[in-house]
């Protein structure tokens, strides 16, 4: 979503890239969508997504890009072996690519004098705040643990698949509400997960990155954990720059969700956010989620080649979300100031340009 947002009033450096904006029209509207209340997701899937199952409403203003996980660590190199004339060579494919992770945060300003924005607050924002408080209302919402411990977790993917919204309506507004429509393109969208669409001739749509199963070897995946720097095809173009995905992720079975699901939060059984759903493999059998926090070591033992913390930062992470939270004095930063746990307070004494 952050890559498709072209808001000329966005924060620097996201608002202007000459060749990018010359080729693409700016974003003119932005909408939030959700399932209507009291409808069972599974039943909706079996009903092939009736048009009344999802509703959406346009915001009065376009969002801004608060944070993207770009240039967040030093570039990690990985050499691929190959044979030529029976000689073995090593090829480093990534020396010119900027590191990136599939994680971004958008900021949306609401004008509560606007009826549509007030409805968004009532029906989208307030329920999210309520859920956040029920989960602890604290920095402890974001999981961090040794990579090997994730294999014992149960993972819950939040968010919603894309469904057609041509004839649905959210709330009656006197002035009317211009809603985003996906049109006929998604009229035959496949269902939620593979187990719900068995027998369907359509395997479903994949998100914006595809990974080859040929690279799922012992060097790239171990007990459900993947090291993105080993993936030859994990390249991303964002605002006219070439990036490659780095860091660590989860490999999740039966999670080839339809396009639009990328960016959904992944929780574990402890109700903590561990990662962001990213993409599916070419075979549609395995999905990936980008881990947000990977500790440098556990009990003094190094467990990763490169640690990073996209939320709170650490000595190895150059850009992280808490930098924006500190600059804007957000609620998260006030929670960081209250905490005595050093894993959250890295940003407090840091000075930024």
From Swiss-Prot:
UniProt xrefs under InterPro entries: Flavi_NS3_S7, Uncharacterised_MG067
GO MF, any single term: RNA binding
Pfam families assigned: Peptidase_S7
Signal peptide (residue range): none
Family of the protein in this entry: Belongs to the MG067/MG068/MG395 family.
Name of the featured protein: Uncharacterized protein MPN_591
């Amino acid at each position: 979503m952050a890559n498709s947002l072209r808001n000329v009033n966005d924060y620097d450096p996201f608002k202007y890239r000459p060749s990018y904006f010359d080729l693409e029209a700016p974003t003119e509207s932005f909408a939030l969508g959700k399932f209507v209340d009291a409808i069972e997701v599974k039943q909706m899937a079996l009903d092939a997504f009736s048009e009344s199952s999802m509703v959406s409403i346009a915001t009065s203003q376009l969002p801004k890009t608060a944070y993207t996980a770009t240039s967040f660590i030093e570039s990690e190199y990985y050499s691929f072996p190959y044979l030529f004339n029976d000689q073995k060579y090593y090829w480093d494919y990534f020396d010119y690519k900027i590191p990136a992770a599939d994680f971004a945060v958008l900021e949306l300003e609401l004008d509560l004098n606007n009826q549509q924005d007030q409805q968004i607050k009532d029906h989208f924002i307030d329920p999210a705040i309520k859920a956040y408080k029920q989960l602890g209302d604290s920095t402890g919402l974001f999981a961090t643990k040794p990579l090997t411990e994730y294999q014992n977790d149960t993972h819950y993917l939040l968010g919603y698949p894309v469904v057609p919204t041509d004839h649905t309506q959210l709330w009656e507004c006197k002035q009317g509400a211009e809603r985003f429509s996906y049109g006929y393109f998604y009229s035959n969208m496949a269902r939620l997960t593979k187990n719900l669409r068995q027998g369907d001739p359509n395997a479903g749509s994949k998100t914006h990155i595809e990974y080859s199963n040929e690279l799922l070897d012992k060097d790239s995946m171990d007990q459900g954990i993947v090291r993105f720097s080993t993936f030859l095809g994990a390249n991303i173009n964002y605002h006219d720059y070439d990036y490659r995905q780095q860091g660590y992720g989860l490999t999740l079975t039966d999670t080839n969700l339809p396009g639009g699901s990328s960016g959904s939060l992944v929780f574990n059984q402890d109700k903590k956010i561990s990662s962001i759903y990213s993409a599916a493999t070419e075979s549609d059998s395995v999905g990936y989620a980008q881990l947000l926090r990977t500790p440098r070591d556990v009990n003094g033992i190094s467990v990763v080649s490169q640690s990073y913390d996209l939320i709170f930062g650490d000595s190895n992470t150059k850009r992280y979300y808490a930098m924006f939270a500190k600059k804007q004095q957000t609620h998260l930063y006030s929670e960081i100031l209250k905490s005595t746990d050093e894993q959250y307070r890295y940003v407090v004494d840091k000075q930024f340009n």
